[in-house]
Amino acid sequence: MTLYEQLVIELTNRSFSLHAAYRSGSTPYELSDREPEPYDQQIEDFARMIEEADCVLVGGGDFYYEDNATYRKHFGKFAERYGFKGAFEGSFYRWPTAEARWGYLATFLDTTLNAPLRKPYRDLDAILAEKDFFVLTTNQDTQFVKLYPWEKVAEIQGDHRFFQCSRCCTDAVWDAVEPVSNMVEAMGDGLEVPTELVPRCPHCGAEAFPWVRGYGNFLQGELYEEQYRKVSEWLDAHARQRILFLELGVGRMTPAFIQEPFWALTAQLPQASYIAVNNKTQFLPRAIEDRGLAVRADIADVLADVRKTLGR
């Protein structure tokens, strides 16, 4: 088992006994009580910490698909029929048939897979332009792998570009891009896909689903372990350097995958530093307050302002 995976497991197990704190949206860690600096100063500090770091480990967390113009464009027919307010509502709806479920999932996956690279990602890329970096993400929206090569990204919660067997009869995953395109084309203006296009495992015939945690029995096989190997090897190679752990948008559902490991590693590595950007919380542990920065603001605004400050 790799270093980072072991750390995630330990922190996840610890969280079970502290469920009340997490359920309330808080954290059991002792947080800094220092008054945050004004926003403009935080942006200056962010830019300075980027420049001072030898390397950066980015932790990309939650990005939400809300009820906006883009959502209505792609999902309007489902919103009108079922009353959904955002794309993720439909992902876990109790659908009456597999054909109806895949009508929605195919639309969701097609929209995700073909979405253009969003500006916050372009701004982040400019910020990291002169740095040795690696990206660890719990996002499955493929934005990071559109931007960076496979070896520079660890997707520890899966990837919408792949299908897996719902029974986990095989360790293999397979391409989802072409089947998704075929389902969307066949569905047209309707709400359901043809029965013969419902994705199935080529080995046992069971229904397939996206290789993403949350859809069912998430396959934690070779591809999953590869994600942890990549980030663990990067950490091992850079442990003696000035690593900046950059946490972007980690929510309260899964803090043990990015946030808490970043806190632990910052505390353990004497030259490490830490930045968190979140529009809902401003958590900075007391143990790393002298080497940390927590910015409560919109990620898109922060990254745009840091990029401007750096002149990139």
What annotation goes with each model-predicted range?
Residues 1-312:
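Conserved catalytic alpha/beta core of Sir2/sirtuin-type deacylases, generalized to analogous enzyme cores
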